[in-house]
């Protein structure tokens, strides 16, 4: 068949080339079909399609059995080489995906490391030879990621688009009010009124958590006095437990310090009233930041591990701490 220069050239499919190589090597349509696990009609159809698409006769049908023509022999040699390289490519890619990464450096905020960290270590044990888990506050961790000292960053900072990096939203948690277990909460109370009964314990504004809480209070209760400030959850909640103050915190932080949290009373913000209306919810979202070219498919595996771990912890939070399940929401986006 004579082709015009304007005709679009469609390369042979892998199946067609596989049938041709099998036919040449076995010497018959029936043997080729047996090797490939398809029908004899399928092999014959592939050969006809090859001849039509290439515009060349591949078999000399004047002989018995038929033999490849010069064009057919050239196609056989090149098709065999292509199929061999494709098979090698598949195996090397699969081997790479199965192989262990030599070192994974994962940075995360303290509350994540203390609660989700153990599940991450177990889940990654079969995927990496060495795991370095670095915890701290968002600004320091972000700097380490920017300097390529971390491969993965779990952060509550809002994503900032940048070349060569990607983000996955993992889960969100809403803040709630932690008060001493025997504290009698006045009906329809505001945070400002409660801070007059017990001092308000603040997280350090060096952390994203402290900045979120301070911004929230500035919008709704700017007159709350700031006397106590903490970098860590443990000392903050220990003082609340001892009836020395109240604080806004999250389920993850409560679980991190559950020794203290089990002796606290936790109230959703929406149960309080500000100027006669329920307080709006305050939440923080955890994101995974990574470099796709470096992490590859492991990124989705890590995200899946986190989501599974959060769902499991959510059941425990509800059972042990008696906090509503809907304060935690897992982001299922891929």
List the predicted regions and their residue ranges:
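Alpha-helical linker/hinge and terminal dimerization helices associated
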Residues: 53-54, 75-97
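Short beta-strand-to-loop elements that line the ligand-binding cleft
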Residues: 129-137, 156, 203, 223-235
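Beta-alpha-beta core module
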Residues: 162-168, 173, 235-292
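A short LG(V/I)-centered, amphipathic sequence patch enriched
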Residues: 51-70
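Short helix-boundary/capping micro-motifs
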Residues: 21-37
């Amino acid at each position: 068949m004579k082709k015009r220069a304007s005709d679009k050239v469609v390369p042979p499919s892998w199946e067609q080339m596989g049938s041709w190589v099998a036919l040449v090597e076995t010497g018959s349509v029936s043997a080729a079909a047996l090797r490939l696990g398809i029908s004899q009609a399928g092999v014959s159809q592939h050969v006809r399609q090859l001849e039509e698409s290439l515009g060349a006769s591949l078999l000399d049908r004047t002989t018995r059995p038929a033999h490849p023509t010069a064009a057919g022999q050239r196609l056989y040699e090149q098709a065999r080489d292509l199929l061999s390289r494709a098979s090698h490519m598949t195996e090397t890619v699969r081997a790479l995906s199965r192989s262990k990464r030599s070192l994974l450096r994962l940075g995360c905020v303290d509350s994540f490391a203390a609660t989700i960290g153990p599940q991450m270590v177990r889940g990654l044990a079969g995927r990496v030879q060495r795991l370095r888990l670095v915890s701290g506050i968002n600004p320091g961790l972000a700097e380490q990621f920017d300097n390529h000292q971390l491969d993965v960053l779990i952060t509550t900072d809002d994503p900032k688009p940048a070349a060569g990096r990607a983000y996955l939203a993992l889960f969100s948690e809403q803040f709630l009010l932690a008060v001493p277990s025997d504290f009698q909460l006045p009906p329809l109370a505001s945070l400002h009124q409660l801070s007059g009964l017990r001092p308000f314990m603040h997280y350090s504004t060096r952390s994203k958590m402290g900045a979120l809480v301070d911004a929230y209070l500035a919008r709704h209760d700017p007159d709350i006095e700031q006397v106590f400030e903490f970098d860590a959850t443990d000392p903050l909640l220990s003082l609340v437990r001892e009836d020395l103050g109240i604080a806004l915190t999250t389920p993850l932080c409560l679980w991190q310090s559950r020794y203290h949290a089990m002796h606290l009373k936790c109230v959703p913000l929406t149960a309080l009233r500000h100027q006669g209306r329920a307080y709006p919810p305050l939440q923080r979202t955890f994101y995974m930041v990574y470099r796709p070219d470096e992490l590859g498919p492991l990124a989705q595996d890590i995200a899946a591990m986190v989501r599974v771990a959060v769902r499991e912890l959510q059941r425990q939070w509800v059972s042990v701490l008696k906090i509503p399940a809907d304060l935690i929401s897992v982001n299922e986006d891929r």
